[in-house]
């Protein structure tokens, strides 16, 4: 397997196996991190999540679309230092609307069916993160990069 294919395979496996991610935004130079339920596109070019429009994260990402998304496989055990994989996705975020929104919600709710009422609430927004780069960390310090064209 080519190195790029191996990275993509590991990224896809991690995105499919994990339900939660941390989205980092910022305002006025002050970083802010938020836990979100997410789904990735099959080609790994986008990460999607739903948030209420009244949240700090929504306010921050509408002012500055640059975001980082952290997804990891840690289990809060000592073995995580050797076994866990983390990826950081660097990209830009925007709210999506119909008709794209309907298609994304189908994919999102297939992974998170318990969030159906929340996801369809008029007070919530579906956010798309367009990935520019992925940074994968394994074995605590082995870093691999994948840049999305």
Task: Enumerate the predicted regions with their spans.
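Short beta-strand segments
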Residues: 18-53, 61, 68-73, 81, ...
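Extreme N-terminal tail/first-helix region
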Residues: 1-21
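Short helix-coil transition/hinge motifs at the ends and kinks of transmembrane helices
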Residues: 6, 76-80
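Structured helix-beta-strand junction loops
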Residues: 17-18, 63-64, 111, 132
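Short gly/pro-enriched beta-turn/loop segments at secondary-structure junctions
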Residues: 16-18, 31, 121-122, 130
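A short, polar/proline- and glycine-enriched secondary-structure boundary/capping micro-motif
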Residues: 58-62, 147-149
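Short acidic (Asp/Glu) patches
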Residues: 51-55, 70-76, 104-115
């Amino acid at each position: 397997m080519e190195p790029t294919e191996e990275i993509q395979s590991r990224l896809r496996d991690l995105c499919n196996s994990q339900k939660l991610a941390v989205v980092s935004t910022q305002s006025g130079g002050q970083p802010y991190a938020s836990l979100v339920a997410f789904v990735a596109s099959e080609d790994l070019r986008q990460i999607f999540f739903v948030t209420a429009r009244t949240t700090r994260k929504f306010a921050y990402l509408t002012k500055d679309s640059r975001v980082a998304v952290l997804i990891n496989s840690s289990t809060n055990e000592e073995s995580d230092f050797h076994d866990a994989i983390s990826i950081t996705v660097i990209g830009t975020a925007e709210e999506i609307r119909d008709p794209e929104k309907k298609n994304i919600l189908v994919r999102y709710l297939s992974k998170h069916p318990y969030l159906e009422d929340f996801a369809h609430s008029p007070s919530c927004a579906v956010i798309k993160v367009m990935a520019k780069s992925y940074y994968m960390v394994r074995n605590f310090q082995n870093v691999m990069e994948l840049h999305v064209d």
